[in-house]
Amino acid sequence: MEGYTSVPQNPNVPPPMQYGPPQTQPGPYGPPQTQPGPYVPPQNVGGYNSTNIPPQGYQGQPMPPVTVVHPPTFGGIQYVYVQDPMAELAMSTGVLIRQQAQFLEQITGCESPNRYYVFSQSPQAGMKLLFKCKEYSSCCMRQCCPANSREFNMYIKHIATVNDLDENFSAPFITVQKPFKCTCCCLERPEMIATFSGTSQPCGRIKQPYTCCDPEFSLYDSSGTKKYIIHGDCCQCGLCCSNNFCGKLSEVFFHIYRDENLTAPVGAIIKKVATATELITSADSYQVNFPLDASPQEKMLLIVAGLMIDYQFFEQSSSDNRND
């Protein structure tokens, strides 16, 4: 070809390498040798947990409100509810009776219906609210009659939920009747009769017999059998001076006996030293120590006996204030 001159080959330079066709053809991709496993979160290193890192907001971001649930309280006592009061009484060795303070009563001088709360104490669960007790009586009876002789009905309600604290929410568990008794010159002796509200079956009664000096109460079961005698010494400061400052700062003991000879006490009902609120009101507190072999029904009657002791010796009505 004209105008084209071939490049002479250099005999000392090897010819370029010639690439042949591939020996094998690429095949299709096979399945992976191992299947992917579940996701494993990173392990804690040096006590640092990346999963507990709180979300970081901007500086000055308001924190969400934190709701703290506190147990209900009464008079500084934290308590819980129970579902079966008789089963709780079967395991309980004692209860605390707290009277609700009536500040309006101190201001007006008019006697108000009494209210009490009964707590069972457990080393594992603390204080357990068992019952709420409220007096139902006429205004004329409260203002004109002494507390140890006036007539009233007391409804003892089992408190299983916070709704049971409402007086009209549920029916009473125990109904206690205290008939009017003219105790002047020991003509009639006061008594309190307890019945189960649901079945109207008698639970028992507590009666205060005539004694010369020392106060005494007799506890009878539903069949009329005398089960316990509750006896107190008249020479106690809290009993002789019950309505003044010295009496409120003293404990009063009423021992529980089984026999007429009062040989060995098996329990006690103790009026506790007044708290700061009880010093300026007529409210009182009682500790009831049950006998070890007492049945739940007998323990219920001992609670009623503690309420009766309050009315007979430590409840100062409006008529008592006028007589002083």
Question: Language-model segments: which ranges?
Answer:
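Low-complexity or membrane-interfacial segments used for flexible interactions
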Residues: 2-17, 22, 32, 37, ...
